[in-house]
Amino acid sequence: MAFNLRNRNFLKLLDFTPKEIAHLLELSAELKKAKYSGYEQPRLTGKNIALIFEKSSTRTRCAFEVAAFDQGAKVTYLGPSGSQIGHKESMKDTARVLGRMYDGIEYRGFGQTIVEELGQYAGVPVWNGLTDEFHPTQILADFLTMQEYANGKQLSQITFAYLGDARNNMGNSLMVGAAKMGMEIRLVAPKQFWPEEELVTQCQEIALQTGAKIVLTEEVTEGVKGCDFLYTDVWVSMGEAPEAWDERVALMTPYQINMDVIKATENPNVKFMHCLPAFHNDETTLGKEIAEKYGMNGLEVTEDVFESEYSIVFDEAENRMHTIKAVMVATLGS
């Protein structure tokens, strides 16, 4: 079934129906196959795209740029120091200026209200590259990756667990995505790190319509048993104070994904996922500081899991580009 998403914003998965999300995933798979097969047809030729990054990025920026280039579009990158947004010019005014010059706008930054305002006033499609509350393009990549590794299961037949800080944009977005697609998600975290009650209630209401199951638990063994996928993210998110580390590490250490947790799934085919970057060894400046301060070689995931046959994080990272391409083509393409 064809769907017309032209001129739609892509700000959060709550705005989309399960069938629309499934359409974007199907289009992602088609575009990925076309790129690999060498017969990709540009559908964004002549389009100009603005990429607003108020937070730094590797995967999201590269994914948007390569996806745009593949499809014939040109991009302008506006980094944290490259615009007047919020300093000398309001987002409302910026939206109306950029909307006159560009055919589509990506935003990666802080509050969800900011990207919502951009979407309200730009007059062209606006895509959320990450906010404090939601990370919808990451979820499309995650679900495409799950489909590729699910051994024939539909999304609605998949059970997965998210361990760690479940109140951040990834916990929120995975819960919304699972609710929309009829999946079973288990948020395994200290209670104070569960998503906001209002969002949980909203997702539970969606789950009643889709057959999804949302479980919140503090028990790791209970949470991971029988899972098809285990997912985690960093324990301290972008923008949080360094002083938060001590308390956070103490609270989160029981939720580290290590080989014992892998075994606790009782599923030899379980796969490990992470939106990246990950603290899994001491080969980075921050990783080395963590190892020295806490005596841990890896935080949210251990090196042996990250580099194991269970890990599909780099397929997941690649799929950022294919799914972002699908969003741009669906909302802007000819």
UniProtKB/Swiss-Prot annotation:
The keyword Cytoplasm applies. One of its GO terms (biological process) is citrulline biosynthetic process. It catalyses: carbamoyl phosphate + L-ornithine = L-citrulline + phosphate + H(+). Its EC number is 2.1.3.3. One of its GO terms (cellular component) is cytoplasm. Carbamoyl phosphate binds at S57, T58, R59, T60, Q84, R108, H135, P136, T137, Q138, C275, L276, R320. The keyword Cytoplasm applies. Gene3D superfamilies: Aspartate/ornithine carbamoyltransferase (3.40.50.1370). This is Ornithine carbamoyltransferase. The gene is argF.
